Amino acid sequence: MARLERDTLRRRPDELSGGQQKRLCIARALAAQPQHIIFDESFSGLDVTLKKQVLDFLKELQTELQISFLVITHDLDTAMYMAGTIHVMRRGKIIETLEHPKSFSDFQEPYSQELVKAVRSKRRALQ
């Protein structure tokens, strides 16, 4: 299920890769057979390649096990990739809800648009 080799269970956490550690945490959560799992900034420390692998793995699990995820993130790219519904919050209140957004242009609230601008400027800086 978590795509971990058997010897992983005998290894210490510091002997596991970042991806193995994340998958082990997910496997531990799945052992309780939940209907919902909350991921609170769970992907922020991962490099782009590893993050994509973990997110793809989660999407497969979501389909296979019919469970829902609540993904709390400051990363709009992750939100767009994972979410069916996105709630944008500011100062503890939901200010915008998007159902199955297709692109960043779907965001309409001024604060949401500022977040999108920040993502775009970060992308330009990295190029």
Model-derived regions, located:
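Conserved catalytic motifs of ABC-family nucleotide-binding domains
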Residues: Q33
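C-terminal boundary and immediately downstream tail of ABC-type ATPase nucleotide-binding domains
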Residues: A2-L4, S105-Q127
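A short, surface-exposed alpha-helical micro-motif characterized by mixed small hydrophobic
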Residues: A79-Y81
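H-loop/switch region of ABC-family ATPase nucleotide-binding domains
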Residues: T73-H74
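Conserved ABC ATPase signature
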Residues: R12-L16, Q20
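Hydrophobic anchor residue at the start of the ABC signature
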Residues: I26
